[in-house]
Amino acid sequence: MHDTFKGYVAPWECDEMGHMNIQFFADKFSQSLLRHLFFLGENSKGTPGTLRALHMRFHKELHASDLAAAHGEVSAFEKENGVLTHFMRNEENGALAATASFHLPLEKMPDEVTPLASEAAPRGLTPGLLFRPGMEAHEGLTETNLSAVRGHECSAEGGLSLKGYFSRLSDCQGHMWRLAGLGRQEQKARGLATATVELHFQFFGALGEDDLIAVHTGLDAVGSKTLHYRHIFFNGKTGAPVAAADGIGLLFDKETRRAIALPEAVHESAAYHRL
């Protein structure tokens, strides 16, 4: 186990939900991964161009002025492929905030492999529910993001950073909830907010400076309190899919911070955008 990150939640990293936005979890975890790879003697920088997948679970919110700390461990290694799992905690009370399991090639045999902790293991997003090649052509998808990669969003290696992907995912969420029948303004009027509790990102290609991005979104399943959404990232110049994110989202009451049942309008609207 290696201590790999220690930082602070700045007020500007928090959104209208009252907690740290998902893109800043991604940013802090990517810094944590970079230090872990250094400790392991790896040359990889762990950028999306080298990552195969990333699985995240969110357990407790982090708020402005909270202290965040992370450590990493090797959860699997086989035939030069590894899984590095990172745990981020609120350093004030020790509560586990989130986990991130990075699937990537490793050049060296690690000294120690620790079985994947239950807190980091897939829960709602089992392998059979995830995006598979060919699904990008599904008619149920709706365009939720059109953007371009700016230079400041890229790593030293030239590709769009993990935070850059998650920044767009965060933007897409507002459009996704509107598709689901409960847009941001109505949420605000009703004292509601949204959160992602589990996320699985897959990477198939790289995006560089000035590349165009298009994201298409659909809903795969809706339960009593959660919905399964999918964002597919395309290279806007070639039309090729470069990444896909499957997530489990929920609604919560902003006052009690507790999850609530999805309104009937969500079930009705989601039926028109289901994958």
What residues fall within each predicted segment?
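A generic, residue-level signal for flexible/boundary positions that often mark functional hotspots
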Residues: 8-14, 52, 56, 148, ...
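A generic structural signal for short, non-catalytic loop/turn and secondary-structure boundary residues
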Residues: 2, 49, 95, 138-140, ...
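Catalytic strand-loop segment that frames the active site of acyl-thioester-processing enzymes
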Residues: 1-35, 39, 124-185
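A short glycine/small-residue-enriched secondary-structure motif
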Residues: 45-52, 80, 96-97, 195
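Hydrophobic, helix-prone linear segments
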Residues: 1-60, 64-67, 178, 253, ...
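A structural signal for short, hydrophobic beta-strand segments that form beta-sheets
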Residues: 51, 72-74, 196, 219
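Structured core of small recognition/catalytic domains
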Residues: 152-246, 250
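HotDog/MaoC-like acyl-thioester-processing domains
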Residues: 3-5, 57-67, 74-137, 203, ...
